[in-house]
C-alpha cells in the first residue's frame, strides 16, 4: 500500500463492516490470510487492487466469495518513524 502512503509496519485502523464502496481501501481475507487492497466490484467480479505498482490486481468471481471476504474499511493509519 506504499502508493497510498501506508508502509510496512504502520498501524491501520479498520472499521468492521462487510461491504465498502468501489475504490475504498479494505481489510480483505483471502483463504484465511488478511491483506489491504482497494476493492472494486463490477457485476459478478471483485477486483482487489494493491496500492503498489509492483503487484498485479487480483480478480475473483463473486462465486469465489467463500474464499474472499471483506472484513472492514480502512479508516486511518499511524506511520511509525
Predicted regions and their residues:
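Acidic/glycine-rich C-terminal interaction modules and beta/coil loop segments
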Residues: 1-81
Amino acid at each position: 500500500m506504499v502508493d497510498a502512503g501506508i508502509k510496512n509496519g504502520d498501524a491501520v485502523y479498520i472499521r468492521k463492516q462487510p461491504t465498502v464502496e468501489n475504490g475504498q481501501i479494505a481489510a480483505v481475507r483471502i483463504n484465511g490470510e488478511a491483506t489491504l487492497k482497494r476493492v472494486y466490484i463490477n457485476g459478478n467480479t471483485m477486483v482487489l487492487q494493491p496500492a503498489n505498482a509492483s503487484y498485479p490486481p487480483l480478480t475473483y468471481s463473486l462465486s469465489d466469495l467463500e474464499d474472499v471476504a471483506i472484513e472492514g474499511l480502512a479508516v486511518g493509519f499511524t506511520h511509525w518513524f
